[in-house]
C-alpha cells in the first residue's frame, strides 16, 4: 500500500474480491531495532506466510478471507516515529507530518518512503481497518522471562504502550584541564544524575513500569572538553496507563529539579 505495508490474501471459493470484510489476518513487522533479536518481527511474518502456504497446499476451504500483513516501520528505530504502517491501516494518523521525522543524517521519513517507491502523500488510501474481523500475531518475547521459566510460549495479556521523551541539559563547554571542578557547569554530570533518578523512579513504580535512557549525544564531544550540552532520549512503558502517566510526570519533574 501507500505506506509500504505488504499484504497477501487468500479468498474463499466464489468470493467477490471487491467485498473486503470479515478478514482474518496475521503477520508482523519487517523492521527491527539494534540487537532486538534476529527473529524480531520475522518470526510472525514468516509464520503467517507458512500458514497461508499450508492452507493453500492442503486445499482448506475458507469461510473468510485470510490475510498476511508485513507492517512497515513498526519500531521507529531510524526516524523515531514508530507504528507507521499499522497507524495508517487503522486510520489513526501520525502525531506530526512524516516530513518532520528525521534520522541522524537529516533524511526525513517522507523522503525515505518516496525513495523506496511508497506514496506518503496518499496514506489516506491505505486506511481499511473496518475490513478486519480478527488479528493474531506470533512474536518473540524480546525478554528473558519465558526462558528463565523454561516455557516455550506465552499468551500476551497486555502491551506496554511506549512514550518517548527527548530533552537536553545545558551547561558550559570549557577546557578540561584549565577549569577547576568547583567552577564547572558540566552538562554530562547533570545527565548522569538524571539517569540515576530515572532508574530509581522506574524501580519504585513496579515490575511492569520500565524506563530506558537509550541515547545520549554530547556536545561538543571532545575528550578534553567539558560537555556544554547533552541531548537524551527516554523510552517509558507500562501496561497501566495511569501508572505510566505518573511515571512520566515524575521523570519530567526530576529533570527540572536537576
Model-identified regions with their sequence ranges:
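Acidic/His- and Gly-rich active-site-bordering loop/insert found
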Residues: 1-37, 55
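Beta-strand segments within the central parallel beta-sheet cores of soluble alpha/beta enzyme folds
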Residues: 3, 25, 61-72, 210-215
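Short amphipathic alpha-helical face segments that pack within enzyme cores
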Residues: 42-50, 189-193
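Short amphipathic alpha-helices in soluble, non-transmembrane regions
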Residues: 246-256
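Midchain, well-structured core segments that form catalytic/ion-binding scaffolds
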Residues: 31, 73-74, 78-241, 256
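Phosphate-handling active-site elements
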Residues: 18, 52-67, 97-102, 200-208
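FAD-binding core of FAD-dependent oxidoreductases
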Residues: 32-46, 78-82
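Short, solvent-exposed loop/turn segments at secondary-structure boundaries
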Residues: 37-40, 179-182, 246
